[in-house]
Regions:
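N-terminal secretory signal peptides that target proteins for export/translocation
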Residues: 1-13
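His-enriched metal-coordination microenvironments in redox/metal-binding proteins
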Residues: 143-433, 440-441, 451
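Alpha-helical and His/Cys-centered functional microenvironments
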Residues: 9-10, 24, 200
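Aromatic- and Gly/Pro-enriched helix-to-coil junctions and flexible linker segments
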Residues: 29-175, 183, 187, 196, ...
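Bacterial N-terminal signal peptides
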Residues: 14-28
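Long, low-complexity, intrinsically disordered segments
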Residues: 446-452
Length: 452
């Protein structure tokens, strides 16, 4: 039903192209010389693009065109003007009144006004001497040059149409000693057919897919209902890929651990888009130069027990995670599918104080973003990370695959998920198991309450 639905890259293409067509009637721009007092590309616009746009808008990345040079940017100025005025680009969905984030890619009003004024004046190029030095990007990577690259053992054939079940493949690292990973990036070779990829670390002796042979693609039955508990998988979430999700580069002194003899388990969700292609995803790792002072672990608050009624416009689902040891909360990542409407993270401290740290009032499932806290939060034992999400299963949701369906947890786009991922920073002498709740408590979804 929804196998042709494409995510992130298509979302970017549709946004940009629709905006471009929308401005065709305004193509009679001023002369390229423009107003003498108008902003210029080299002096005023290029620095904004370097800071906020070029990580995606450059050759080989997810965006459909490059913004590295004036010549590459100039044909798209009309679309740019509308996109920044409507705050469609760069993609950023956090409520500006709640929380502050180190990776906030949204434009300030001054930056928006600069781009709008530049386009209105005819997009003058300006003095080449004003052009800032090119940003330093590693070709083919969003991380520093990888120390190790691990790749799928062979290409996977993604068909022209139909549904592709989640694909898994185990790739041995060959590490003979423990490695501390300071930066990691997953790069598919065919981004347009990838819904998401997760690279898990499977330690020696783990029961996680213990009967599967390395180097061979296989499918796994999806978790259901009370068995859905990604906070307690017998593997470690290393890094993920989804449209709009940048590479993971941890601060100095922090790293994720990959033990000697570990394997990487790739989970790949392909979505056919009308063209048969071959994908051979790779994973780049950059190692810390010395043992870190802090270890980083990706965990989650998750609820897989919900049943969203047909037509419900505002169904509420809650999940929480209780802290056992003192940790630092560094970043958060809400995850839902097409019916996702809004998402909120709160911290409830042992004394009862509640603090809202992220509110996404208009969730956009095409963009799977991490939000890095500008000031990480120390969480004492007994604190809780609480997540609340609402889903719109009504006909008024243009993304809804089928408003007549009762929706439960599932892996495909037409199913739903409710996961609040987060990165915890902690003493490396602790085990990840020390962070997990002592007793599994399955979150219960609450009935829909309009307006809540």
């Amino acid at each position: 039903m929804n196998s042709s639905r494409r995510r992130g890259l298509d979302a970017m293409n549709r946004t940009v192209l629709s905006l471009l067509f929308a401005v065709c009637s305004t193509a009679h721009l001023s002369s390229q010389m423009g107003n003498m007092n108008a902003p210029t590309f080299t002096k005023d616009v290029a620095p904004i693009l370097q800071k906020n746009c070029q990580s995606c808008h450059r050759p080989g990345e997810a965006a459909p065109f490059s913004m590295l040079t004036y010549e590459e940017t100039r044909p798209w100025t009309g679309a740019m003007k509308l996109a920044v005025k409507q705050k469609l680009m760069p993609p950023w969905f956090a409520d500006p009144q709640v929380g502050h984030f180190a990776n906030d890619r949204s434009l300030s009003q001054k930056e928006i006004d600069t781009i709008v004024a530049w386009v209105t004046a005819g997009a003058p190029k300006g003095d080449p001497k004003d052009m800032p030095a090119p940003a330093n990007f590693v070709e083919g990577w969003g991380i520093p040059k990888p120390d190790v690259i691990l790749q799928l053992p062979k290409e996977f054939p993604v068909p022209e149409s139909g549904m592709v079940e989640y694909q898994y493949v185990i790739v041995p690292t060959g590490f003979t000693e423990d490695k501390w990973v300071q930066a990691a990036e997953v790069r598919p070779t065919e981004r347009s057919v990838v819904h998401h990829i997760i690279a898990y670390v499977r330690e020696p002796g783990s029961n996680y897919f213990k009967d599967q042979k390395p180097g061979v693609f296989f499918e796994a039955p999806p978790a259901k209902d009370e068995n859905v508990d990604t906070s307690a998988l017998p593997s470690d979430f290393l890094v993920g890929y989804a449209p709009g999700q940048p590479a993971e580069v941890l601060p100095a002194g922090e790293a994720k651990l990959v033990k000697a003899g570990s394997d990487i388990v790739f989970e790949v969700h392909y979505t056919p888009n009308g063209k048969a292609v071959m994908d051979r995803t790779k994973l780049g790792l950059v190692f810390a130069k010395e043992p870190p002072k802090k270890r980083v672990q990706t965990l989650s608050a998750v609820n897989g027990t919900f049943k969203i009624p047909p037509g419900d416009p505002n169904y509420r689902v809650d999940a929480s995670f209780e802290i056992r040891k003192e940790v630092i909360l560094a970043s958060i990542h809400p995850h839902m599918h097409a019916r996702g409407k809004d998402f909120e993270y709160r911290i409830v401290f042992p004394g009862g104080e509640t603090r809202t740290i992220l509110r996404v009032p208009q969730y956009n499932w095409h963009w799977q973003l991490w939000y890095n806290l500008d000031e990480p939060i120390v969480l004492p034992p007994g604190a809780r990370i609480e997540c609340t999400a609402h889903f719109d299963n009504s006909p008024n949701n243009p993304e809804n695959p089928d408003p007549t369906k009762t929706v439960i947890w599932g892996q495909q786009n037409w199913d739903e998920m409710m996961v609040g991922f987060f990165n915890l920073v902690y003493d490396p002498r602790l085990s990840p198991k020390d962070l997990l709740p002592e007793k599994k408590e399955v979150a219960k979804s609450k009935a829909s309450v309009a307006g809540k």
